[in-house]
């Protein structure tokens, strides 16, 4: 009967290990050794594995079972059977008072009386507290305590940090019967080792080859972009999904081809509906029908090209998989691989292996980060960093060069590595590109502007607002909800943090950043350490902008070092010297007329692009328009912001009115011409054709 209780309410992990049903466990030798040390004690020989979800606590127990089967454990543990207790089965159907307690007592007695020693594994150990605790009954934890203390019931428990703190720490009598084994998230090298040990199992299951580059990419990309979860769990899921996607691509029609076929089908349905309307005498849909026909022609051409490519890829893939199975055809395999690569040209419809691109594609679908950003070569990108940012930030070459040099040093590991990647204070007049620099950096370095965390410090002018940034302390309203800054960085540790208008913040708020700039950590309201070491922190300020503009208007050839000397006393008066020494100051100069003209051209090009996107208009702009707008924007106190203001006040209202007039008259404009007249100012001419 007692053996029946064991078979009914527990599962034999060592039996599964003997049958080869457990995946190999690597990279956890230290933790398994700690467990063996504790299990070999005479009394209170009960380890409890504590770690974040997904770090591999259950896998540790499976690793111990594999070692027991292999005999790679001390003599006292070799005859041991490792069983996992299922509390759900214990509770299911235990409707009568005392039945749950009797079942658990039977399991405890069966373990103690078993001829072969039994180790009991209790996953989610916090569920012991309160389990079965009906009115007048005792919970599972209280039934286990005596046996645990005497060492008669050797138990391995597992739980997360939050549940350990919430349940087990409060029950000191239960906590002292367990010895904690901390299970931390592995570093990248250890995580790669873990995935390599599992790779063959997943390759065999999906019947695909997984490259070693894919393993490394799964670890690095999951750590960088799947920040809510822990390694190795998230990397394993990523690799598993990528392998499933490769298998599916070999067995089904590619997504690109399916998408085009769906678009053609939807256009066909719309065309049929319009023809039915015309047949019963409704209004003429000739314009839309001709547009549908043009779209269909484009899509059909794309579909035919894809079908030809797909057929050729299928043929080559079949030959390649066949040649791989014969080791004597290695040279042929290489030629087929090269031929397939030449056909695909970085736009593959089929994937033969799980490679970096496949893994990056899964991450792109999960996170929304563009695939092109995930596949960037970071080394090449760093070499051209100032050029990439300079496409958006005009006229600040010296400042961008200074930022790029410091970031290159940080990224190549030449700096100390204690604090954030870099901390910059961007000083200069309003509208010269300081905030745009942060947007461009987030886009270039971290895959998009969504990686920019913006905190406007003008909202933090009182000392009590510190709690909004880092979270309320215990006992205060809002405790447990996290802080605006700490939660944003915890969820997206690879990001650009923009502290806008830093000179307006209260000094107590600035004191918060001493340790962030120095060590790269901030402790939030709940006591968790938030890691800032992968962030780039930019602060913007208008301090000294009047001095800068006055000096540069009088002496345009003033050097950077002279400008730094000019504003240093002002910065030292406002920021404490200890804080000032923790970041690099970068000076942004007022925009020159040539830089302003470039910005005017960029802004007008964006307007033209929107017009073409929404209305199909082709736009021509007279050179005098650029000259007139540039001269009107050369106000030193507003910078490039005046360009947007002028366009919103002078161009867009008139243009929108004319567009609405043409649309109301059922006329479709084809082209827009922008000119400048000394008498009338901006001249807008829409050339249209009458509606059919």
Give the residues covered by each predicted segment.
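AAA+ P-loop NTPase nucleotide-binding core of proteostasis motors
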Residues: 1-692
């Amino acid at each position: 009967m007692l053996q029946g209780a064991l078979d009914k309410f527990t599962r034999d992990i060592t039996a599964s290990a003997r049958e080869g049903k457990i995946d190999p466990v690597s990279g956890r030798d230290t933790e398994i050794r700690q467990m063996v040390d504790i299990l070999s004690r005479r009394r209170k020989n009960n380890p409890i594995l504590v770690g974040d979800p997904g770090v591999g606590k259950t896998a540790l127990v499976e690793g111990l079972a594999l070692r027991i089967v292999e005999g790679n454990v001390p003599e006292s543990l070799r005859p041991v059977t490792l069983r996992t207790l299922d509390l759900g089965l214990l509770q299911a159907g235990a409707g009568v008072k005392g039945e749950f307690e009797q079942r658990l007592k039977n399991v405890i007695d069966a373990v103690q009386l078993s001829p072969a020693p039994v180790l009991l594994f209790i996953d989610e150990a916090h569920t012991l507290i309160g389990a079965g605790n009906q009115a007048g009954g005792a919970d599972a934890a209280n039934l286990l305590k005596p046996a645990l203390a005497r060492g008669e019931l050797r138990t391995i428990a597992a739980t997360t940090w939050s549940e350990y703190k919430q349940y087990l720490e409060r029950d000191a009598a239960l906590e002292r019967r367990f010895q904690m084994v901390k299970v931390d998230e592995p570093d990248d090298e250890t995580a790669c080792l873990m995935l390599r040990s599992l790779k063959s199992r997943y390759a065999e299951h999906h019947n695909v080859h997984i490259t070693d580059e894919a393993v490394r990419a799964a670890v690095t990309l999951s750590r960088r972009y799947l920040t809510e979860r822990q390694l190795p769990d998230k990397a394993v899921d990523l690799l598993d999904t990528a392998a499933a996607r490769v298998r599916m691509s070999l067995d089904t029609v590619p997504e690109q081809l399916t998408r085009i076929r769906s678009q053609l089908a939807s256009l066909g349905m719309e065309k049929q509906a319009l023809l039915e309307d015309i047949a019963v005498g409704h209004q003429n849909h000739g314009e839309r029908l001709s547009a549908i026909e043009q779209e269909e022609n484009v899509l059909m051409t794309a579909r035919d090209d894809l079908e030809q490519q797909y057929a050729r890829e299928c043929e080559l893939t079949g030959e390649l998989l066949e040649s791989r199975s014969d080791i004597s055809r290695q040279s042929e395999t290489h030629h087929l691989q090269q031929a397939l690569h030449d056909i695909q040209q970085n736009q593959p419809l089929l994937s033969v292996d799980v490679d970096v691109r496949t893994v990056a594609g899964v991450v792109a679908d999960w996170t929304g980060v563009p695939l092109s950003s995930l596949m960037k070569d970071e080394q090449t990108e760093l070499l051209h960093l100032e050029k990439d940012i300079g496409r958006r930030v005009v006229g600040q070459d010296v400042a961008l060069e200074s930022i790029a040099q410091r970031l290159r040093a940080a990224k190549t590991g030449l700096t100390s590595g204690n604090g954030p990647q870099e901390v910059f204070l961007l000083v200069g007049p309003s509208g010269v590109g300081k905030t745009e620099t942060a947007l461009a950096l987030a886009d270039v370095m971290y895959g998009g502007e969504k990686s920019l965390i913006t905190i406007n410090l003008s909202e933090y002018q009182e000392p009590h607002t510190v709690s909004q940034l880092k979270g309320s302390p215990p006992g205060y309203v809002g405790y447990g909800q996290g802080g605006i800054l700490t939660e944003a960085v915890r969820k997206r540790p690879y990001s650009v943090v923009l502290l806008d208008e830093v000179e307006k913040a209260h000094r107590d708020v600035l004191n918060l950043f001493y340790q962030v700039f120095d060590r790269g950590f901030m402790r939030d309201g709940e006591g968790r350490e938030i890691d800032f070491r992968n962030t780039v922190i930019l602060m913007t300020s208008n301090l000294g902008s009047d001095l800068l503009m006055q000096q540069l208007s009088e002496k345009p050839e003033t050097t950077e070092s002279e400008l730094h000397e000019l504003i240093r006393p002002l910065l030292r008066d406002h920021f404490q010297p200890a804080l000032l020494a923790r970041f690099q100051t970068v000076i942004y100069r007022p925009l020159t007329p040539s830089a302003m003209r470039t910005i005017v051209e960029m802004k007008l090009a964006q307007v033209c692009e929107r017009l073409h996107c929404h209305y199909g208009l082709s736009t021509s702009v007279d050179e005098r328009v650029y000259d007139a707008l540039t001269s009107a924007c050369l106000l030193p106190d507003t910078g490039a912001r005046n360009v947007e203001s002028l366009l919103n006040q002078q161009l867009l209202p008139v243009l929108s009115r004319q567009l609405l007039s043409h649309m109301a008259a059922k006329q479709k404009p084809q082209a827009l011409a922008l000119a400048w007249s000394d008498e009338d100012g901006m001249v807008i001419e829409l050339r249209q054709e009458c509606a059919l």
